């Protein structure tokens, strides 16, 4: 098994291994802006004890053109119906990252 932090980092950087959801506020932006926001999510590395107390790299926020952008990774079973019983096991877990305006 791999640790949750590594699985989350790999997913966040590649967007492979789960689903990425953009809220209405993000989708309303120009295509170029959405691409820039997605790139900032992929490159995010400002993890601190305050925003990452469990060292899972499952949440981040940054400013983009005067707006705060948040992203959060949640862990679901393979059918996306229930929360995963073991987020460190990719055999039983799908990741869902939601990117939104604060």
Where does each model-flagged region fall?
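Short, compact, well-ordered microdomains
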Residues: 58-102
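Compact soluble domain cores
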Residues: 2-62
């Amino acid at each position: 098994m791999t640790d949750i932090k590594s699985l989350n980092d790999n997913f966040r950087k590649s967007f492979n291994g789960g689903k990425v959801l953009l809220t209405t506020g993000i989708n309303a932006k120009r295509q170029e802006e959405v691409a820039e926001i997605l790139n900032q999510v992929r490159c995010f590395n400002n993890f601190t004890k305050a925003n990452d107390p469990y060292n899972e790299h499952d949440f981040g926020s940054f400013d983009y053109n005067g707006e705060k952008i948040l992203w959060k990774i949640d862990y679901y079973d393979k059918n996306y119906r229930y929360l995963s019983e073991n987020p460190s096991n990719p055999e039983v877990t799908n990741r869902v990252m939601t990117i939104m305006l604060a």
